[in-house]
Design a protein with these regions (language model features):
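Basic, Lys/Arg-enriched alpha-helical interface segments
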Residues: 1-67, 76-83, 87, 91-96
Length: 96
């Protein structure tokens, strides 16, 4: 567990996804809680199903906010930056 709070750096795509999540009426507080947990360097709960991604998203991680609402992120350890890459449904993010 990290002792230093990470700097949160949302991508342009994440900012658009965030606005779409609000428009869809999703409980944005759930997303913000997960982001805060990650930024504090704490471990997510098992129900968030946090795991590494492969393929085009290699080097990133994914966690579940809700069963079909995901957050793709990356922690850049040397500079302690939490990069928020995307958020949305499985089909939004992976076309499935």
């Amino acid at each position: 567990m990290r002792k230093t709070k990470l700097t949160v750096k949302p991508t342009t795509a994440f900012k658009k996804d965030y606005k779409l999540a609000i428009k869809r009426g999703l409980q944005i507080e759930l997303l913000e809680t997960v982001i805060e947990t990650l930024a504090m360097g704490s471990t997510l709960l098992p129900e968030n199903r946090d795991h590494d991604l492969t393929g085009n998203w290699r080097g990133h991680r994914e966690c579940h906010i809700q069963p079909d609402w995901l957050l793709i992120y990356r922690i850049e350890g040397d500079v302690l930056v939490l990069t928020l890459s995307r958020t949305g449904t499985h089909s939004d993010l992976f076309g499935k």
